[in-house]
């Protein structure tokens, strides 16, 4: 269940508006995959404003301290949302991309494993953090990001994304692990 301070906007027509502008690229990056491309949402200023406003209105009264974004499209969304909410932004990067002392978390992918890192001083104990990415597929990256933030003493108030691909099991995994999750729209299949 979501934090009582988080207000869920009435997404009715907004969800359809945004969903209709997400491009589906068949057979990319491999045959059988339906890639959900959010770049059309970012390219149109009106659409980008609508998208960001969904997140801003949801979290404006959530008493957050930081927004953390997952490499790479979570950086785009997270930084803009943080700016609009007058909060700091924390990048969660792929291994080897941060210059200072880091904390790392390995997670499993369909085809192996990967590692994400965060600066060791990225947040303080007790910080309330929104964790944001573009899409929830298997949930591994967001779960790893949550673990990093919690290892530094932060509380991840909610995970957020534009797209949920529920058939890949990520949203269920995250919710079963106790992470409240907000997504703007969902697509069946993968």
From Swiss-Prot:
Entry keyword Cytoplasm: yes
Compartments, as annotated in UniProt: Cytoplasm
A matching Pfam family: Pribosyltran
One GO BP: AMP salvage
This enzyme's EC code(s): 2.4.2.7
The protein's annotated pathway: Purine metabolism; AMP biosynthesis via salvage pathway; AMP from adenine: step 1/1
One of the record's GO cellular component terms: cytoplasm
PROSITE patterns: PUR_PYR_PR_TRANSFER (PS00103)
Record-level Gene Ontology MF annotations: adenine binding; adenine phosphoribosyltransferase activity; AMP binding
Family annotation (InterPro entries): Ade_phspho_trans, PRibTrfase_dom, PRTase-like, UPRTase/APRTase
Transferase listed as a keyword: yes
Alphabetically ordered keywords of this record: Cytoplasm, Glycosyltransferase, Purine salvage, Transferase
Domain of life, per lineage: Bacteria
Reactions that this protein is recorded to catalyse: AMP + diphosphate = 5-phospho-alpha-D-ribose 1-diphosphate + adenine
PANTHER family, alphabetized: ADENINE PHOSPHORIBOSYLTRANSFERASE (PTHR32315:SF3)
Reported function: Catalyzes a salvage reaction resulting in the formation of AMP, that is energically less costly than de novo synthesis.
Family stated for the protein in its record: Belongs to the purine/pyrimidine phosphoribosyltransferase family.
Subunit structure, interactors included: Homodimer.
Record's protein name: Adenine phosphoribosyltransferase
UniProt source species: Cupriavidus pinatubonensis (strain JMP 134 / LMG 1197)
């Amino acid at each position: 269940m979501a934090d009582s301070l988080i207000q869920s906007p009435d997404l009715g027509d907004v969800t359809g508006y945004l969903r209709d502008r997400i491009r589906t690229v068949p057979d990319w990056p491999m045959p059988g995959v339906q890639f959900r491309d959010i770049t059309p949402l970012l390219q149109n200023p009106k659409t980008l404003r609508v998208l960001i406003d969904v997140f801003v209105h949801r979290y404006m009264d959530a008493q957050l301290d930081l927004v953390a974004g997952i490499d790479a499209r979570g950086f785009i969304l997270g930084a803009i949302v943080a700016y609009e909410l007058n909060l700091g932004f924390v990048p969660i990067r792929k291994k080897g991309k941060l210059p200072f002392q880091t904390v790392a978390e390995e997670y499993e992918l369909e085809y192996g494993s990967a590692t994400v890192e965060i600066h060791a001083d990225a947040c303080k104990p007790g910080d309330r953090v929104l964790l944001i990415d573009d899409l929830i597929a298997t949930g591994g990256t967001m779960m790893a990001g949550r673990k990093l933030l919690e290892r530094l003493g932060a509380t991840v108030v909610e995970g957020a994304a534009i797209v949920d691909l529920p058939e890949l099991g990520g949203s269920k995994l995250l919710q079963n692990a106790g992470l409240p999750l907000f997504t703007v729209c969902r697509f069946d299949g993968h």
